[in-house]
Curated annotation (Swiss-Prot):
It is found in: Cell inner membrane. Could be involved in insertion of integral membrane proteins into the membrane. It is a peripheral membrane protein. One of its GO terms (cellular component) is plasma membrane. It comes from the Bacteria. Belongs to the UPF0161 family. Keywords: Cell inner membrane, Cell membrane, Membrane. NCBIfam families: membrane protein insertion efficiency factor YidD. Pfam families: YidD. PANTHER family: MEMBRANE PROTEIN INSERTION EFFICIENCY FACTOR-RELATED (PTHR33383:SF1). This is Putative membrane protein insertion efficiency factor.
């Protein structure tokens, strides 16, 4: 479920986060209070949300990463339409791609899912 609304902006943000992971984060000790790390959280959100919504959620996540927060496991969430499970066997085999993410429904709403990378 790639975000195709603004692929250019998503590509710029994704490239900058990958650059941060490769060149800056690789030379510092691992000190993230959350799982997934803030940079992985950002990459996962950019796959499912529009870049502006993703940047808002990423900013909240980065602001919550401070000494006064206990951290823990905090998966990103997204709102999606429930996928149709009524597909023929032929369509499923033809359209099947490698599973990259699990979308686990939250208890808040049927349209809100946790994004978990496989």
């Amino acid at each position: 479920m790639r975000n195709n609304k603004t692929p250019f902006l998503s590509a710029i943000f994704t490239a900058s986060i990958r650059g941060y992971q490769r060149f800056f984060s690789a030379f510092t000790f691992s000190s993230c209070r959350f799982y997934p790390t803030c940079s992985n959280y950002a990459l996962w959100l950019l796959c499912f949300e529009s870049p502006l919504v993703a940047m808002g959620k990423i900013a909240i996540r980065i602001l919550s990463c401070n000494p006064f927060c206990s951290g823990g496991i905090a998966y990103p969430t997204t709102r999606l339409k429930r996928p149709s499970l009524l597909q023929s066997h032929k369509d499923f085999n033809r359209n099947f791609k490698t599973i990259t993410f699990w979308l686990v429904p939250t208890t808040k709403s049927r349209a809100t899912y946790y994004i978990i990378k496989v």
